[in-house]
């Protein structure tokens, strides 16, 4: 880019071949601001007449995005809920030297990295409730003070199948009862709520510590991923014999 050519406006060329006339021409490198609004064509030659010359810079020089991904999987790595994704974008203006292709990041014409909408935070993410399973964390923590050089955030929440109340009895006449899967806590993916203890007529239920569980009661397991054995014992049976006079119909003795 021409600055001055050293050629006076009133100069007259002479006809003396033996005397040089000297002029000093001042040139400077042309500088072009580049940003997401005016990105030029990344990778294309700055000077179309020089296809092997300097190229316009890649977009990451002035436009960066930090990504967050939270995956929800079971113990085998199978997806159990939709991924959570988020992103924070940063932009700036750089200046490109049209002669060398150098990307200038400070000084006249440049701007510092700025977060879109001023957002530099990934909010905490509450883990979704997955029926029949519990998560190893109720939420992923917030990530604050992100900048253009921050690494992507990748989190994994692992789910484990919930346990059940398992009825059991050593009594040979025990009719059996269905297992009861622990209900999920709808407000916390890491917890279950108390499970209803099956009622079996003629039998009394006991928890693993031997405590009697009344009919219709509910039991809160200490570990939501472990089965709990509920032991049933036969109730003591009582009977009576009455003696009746066939003639009078009166009860003589009980």
Where are these predicted regions, by residue range?
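Extracellular modular ligand-binding repeats in secreted and cell-surface proteins
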Residues: 1-254
């Amino acid at each position: 880019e021409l600055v001055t050519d050293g050629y006076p406006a009133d100069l007259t060329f002479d006809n003396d071949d033996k005397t040089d006339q000297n002029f000093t021409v001042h040139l400077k490198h042309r500088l072009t601001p580049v940003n997401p609004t005016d990105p030029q064509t990344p990778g294309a030659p700055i000077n179309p007449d020089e296809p092997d010359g300097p190229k316009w810079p890649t977009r990451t020089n002035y436009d960066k995005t930090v990504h967050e991904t939270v995956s929800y999987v079971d113990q085998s790595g199978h997806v159990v809920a939709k991924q959570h994704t988020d992103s924070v974008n940063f932009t700036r203006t750089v200046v490109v030297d049209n002669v060398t292709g150098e990307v200038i990041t400070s000084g006249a014409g440049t701007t510092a990295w700025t977060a879109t909408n001023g957002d530099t935070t990934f909010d905490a993410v509450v883990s979704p409730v997955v029926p029949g399973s519990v998560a190893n964390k109720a939420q992923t923590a917030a990530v604050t003070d992100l900048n253009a050089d921050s690494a992507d955030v990748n989190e994994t929440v692992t789910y484990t199948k919930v346990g059940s109340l398992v009825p059991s009895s050593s009594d040979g006449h025990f009719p059996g009862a269905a297992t009861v899967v622990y209900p999920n806590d709808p407000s916390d993916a890491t917890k279950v709520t108390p499970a209803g203890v099956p009622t079996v007529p003629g039998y009394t239920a006991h928890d693993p510590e031997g405590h009697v569980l009344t009919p219709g009661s509910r039991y809160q397991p200490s570990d939501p991923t472990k089965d709990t054995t509920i032991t049933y014992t036969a109730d003591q049976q009582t009977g009576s014999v009455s003696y009746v006079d066939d003639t009078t119909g009166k009860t003589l003795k009980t």
